[in-house]
């Protein structure tokens, strides 16, 4: 009898731990638009992003590649200035540039807010 209660208690602890871990890591907040920030069919480059791309020698093709294949840096992602969700995607270009691209999914398409070369500081006069 004691063994049965021990097994039930262990199972209950595992279930509660799983729920706690899942909520802590947002596993239960997944939606159908979870990867909307990776859809580059309608890419909108802000004036700031175009300027940064020019300064840092980053092409639109490299931006798309990072958006499709890059890793989300959750510590650099979050709410933008307008209250929208922003995603910081990081990866390496074909030219071995370590790039971070910050995007936000908008009604009109995917907006590229900025891009950063993480390994090299380029002179730039963008504002």
Model regions: which residues?
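Ribonuclease/tRNase effector modules and their secretory precursors
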Residues: 1-127
